[in-house]
């Protein structure tokens, strides 16, 4: 942070603050702090963009080149980009191949190789080199499981991208995430595990937690099931230490961070094909259905004030899910050329 510029702002304002009421002072300082945080975000984004552009000009591939540490700006830039809305196959990208799986997949890493299992068969692939960096992309409409070489297990929701080392060894374990995942991190006190999004860093030793970080969403959140988690980030004023049954939320629209006690099942039951809502706006509900089923919706303006409370089973298909919503909310829906039109 450029402390000189902030000191200048403070020195300009202090002589006049004596003329302000206490409430006005509080609002003014809050606005200054918010602007300062936004400036940090702008600087970080500028550094990332310049680093990525420099790599392209130099003829260097953004993705599979350089050391893990030196490539961090490129990885952050990569995961900050929204996933394409179109569906497709689940993809595992390595330094020398692209593996596509049409149905929900489980990818497991071992010493020197990794396996890819779908509903039909299991295939074995060699890991070319210990430092190889892989990427797994789960398109909208599909989910997948990823078991890392250190023993950490991940369930990946629709529209999720993960960048990780094929062989996790050394004193630190890191992954880069765009989308949503539930993690059961293998406990290792000598090697912290860190999940990096484009805004936050989540550090643990061994725990179970959910991370939601879709680039198209204003908010990013972490829900802790067990263990301990530390959340940091360039946009945060300080580190947040989480306890089980807490949810941390960062709102990028106003740079606000919050920590609250929640029912963790509301945020993790998607791993079982269930969604639970407590007064959720129907547009937020439809957004989650859009990602899960890779479906398109057109909403009439008359539904914007509808809220949904209850449990929704996703395993019976999109029409069954919409029928359940219709029963509790009174909405009408119809499918016209793969576009669901929603109205009262």
Specify the residue positions occupied by each region the protein language model found.
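Membrane-interface anchoring determinants
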Residues: 1-85
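A residue-level detector for the "anchor" residue at the start of short, highly conserved motifs
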Residues: 32, 44-48, 60-344
């Amino acid at each position: 942070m450029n402390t000189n510029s902030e000191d200048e702002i403070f020195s300009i304002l202090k002589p006049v603050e004596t003329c302000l009421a206490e409430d006005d002072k509080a609002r003014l300082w809050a606005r200054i702090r918010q602007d300062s945080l936004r400036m940090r975000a702008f600087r970080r984004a500028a550094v990332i963009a310049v680093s990525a552009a420099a790599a392209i000009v130099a003829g260097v591939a953004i993705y599979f080149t350089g050391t893990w540490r030196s490539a961090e700006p490129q990885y952050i830039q990569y995961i900050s980009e929204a996933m394409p809305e179109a569906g497709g196959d689940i993809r595992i990208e390595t330094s020398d191949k692209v593996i596509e799986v049409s149905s929900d997949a489980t990818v497991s890493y071992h010493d020197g190789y990794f396996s890819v299992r779908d509903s039909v068969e299991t295939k074995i692939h060699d890991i070319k080199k210990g430092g190889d960096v892989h990427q797994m992309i789960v398109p909208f409409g599909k989910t997948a499981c990823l078991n890392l070489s250190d023993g950490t297990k991940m369930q990946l929701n629709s529209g999720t991208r993960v960048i990780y080392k094929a062989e996790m060894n050394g004193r630190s374990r890191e992954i880069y995430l765009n989308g949503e995942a539930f993690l059961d991190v293998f406990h290792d006190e000598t090697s912290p595990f860190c999940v990096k999004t484009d805004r936050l860093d989540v550090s643990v030793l061994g725990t179970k937690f959910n991370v939601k970080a879709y680039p198209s969403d204003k908010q990013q959140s972490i829900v802790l099931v067990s263990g301990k988690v530390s959340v940091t980030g360039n946009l945060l004023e300080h580190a947040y230490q989480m306890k089980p049954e807490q949810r941390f939320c960062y709102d990028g629209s106003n740079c606000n961070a919050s920590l609250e006690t929640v029912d963790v099942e509301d945020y993790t039951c998607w791993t079982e094909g269930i969604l639970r809502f407590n007064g959720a706006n129907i547009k937020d509900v439809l957004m989650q259905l859009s990602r899960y089923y890779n479906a398109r919706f057109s909403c009439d303006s008359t539904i914007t004030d509808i809220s949904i409370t209850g449990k929704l089973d996703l395993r019976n298909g999109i029409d069954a899910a919409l029928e359940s919503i219709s029963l509790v909310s009174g909405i009408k829906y119809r499918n016209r050329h793969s576009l669901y039109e929603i109205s009262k």
